[in-house]
UniProtKB/Swiss-Prot annotation:
<dbReference type="InterPro" id="IPR050063">
    <property type="entry name" value="Ribosomal_protein_uL29"/>
</dbReference>
<dbReference type="InterPro" id="IPR036049">
    <property type="entry name" value="Ribosomal_uL29_sf"/>
</dbReference>
<dbReference type="GO" id="GO:0006412">
    <property type="term" value="P:translation"/>
</dbReference>
<dbReference type="GO" id="GO:0003735">
    <property type="term" value="F:structural constituent of ribosome"/>
</dbReference>
<dbReference type="GO" id="GO:0022625">
    <property type="term" value="C:cytosolic large ribosomal subunit"/>
</dbReference>
<keyword id="KW-0689">Ribosomal protein</keyword>
<keyword id="KW-0687">Ribonucleoprotein</keyword>
<protein>
    <recommendedName>
        <fullName>Large ribosomal subunit protein uL29</fullName>
    </recommendedName>
</protein>
<dbReference type="InterPro" id="IPR001854">
    <property type="entry name" value="Ribosomal_uL29"/>
</dbReference>
<dbReference type="Pfam" id="PF00831">
    <property type="entry name" value="Ribosomal_L29"/>
</dbReference>
<comment type="similarity">
    <text>Belongs to the universal ribosomal protein uL29 family.</text>
</comment>
Amino acid sequence: MKAAELRNLTNEELMNLLEEKKRTLMNLRFQNVLGQLNDHSQISKTKKDIARIKTILRERELGVRR
């Protein structure tokens, strides 16, 4: 997801999405260990999505506008 799309979501929606992405990352890591993961780039994409969500939540906490 792009940061602009994420900024249109509410804090509650972002928190729910963050939990979903964390579960997805955990599942991807398990699949990777078991050798079932075909597209390894999904792990880094999911980690970057998590970072984007956390950044937007922190910006809102500090009152930073973008």
